[in-house]
Amino acid sequence: LYVEQHFGPEAKARMGELIANLVEACRRNISDLDWMTPATREKALTKLGKFTPKIGYPAHWRDYSALVVDRGDLVGNYARAMSFEQDREFAKIGAPVDRDEWFMTPQTVNAYYNPGMNEIVFPAAILQPPFFDPDADDAANYGGIGAVIGHEIGHGFDDQGAKYDGDGNLVD
């Protein structure tokens, strides 16, 4: 419901363009760094080329139909929700990693870089004014959400993100 009302497909497409442009700017900057060895530069460019952006909302929604909710049972609802989530997490054991899973809800005003998946994630709620407006000019959007995009890209190469390769493998 939140996404339907506050984040249309045109906003998702516009955000995709901004991310692609900033990734390209980072690629050019890394290519021009003279203090990096050629091998290090190549690894950085490879990693940057494998960044996966997630914009707005997940490709598929979690199914909560099996969760019993009773308006008159706050404590029971909490206990059932915790049990439901625990069962969902336990079901992941031995299963392939779901690369479509999000670790933040669309209505959260935040963004994150996930080094284990080499992905940058921008929930729909941060893609609203004053950070982002699909009807605003490029200068306003680069000044708003562009700073957030650059910040999240930067995490891929900071003291923690640099420990992972472009496939999300811990290498250092």
Language-model regions, residue ranges each:
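Intrinsically disordered, low-complexity linker/terminal regions across diverse proteins
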Residues: 3-152, 156-172
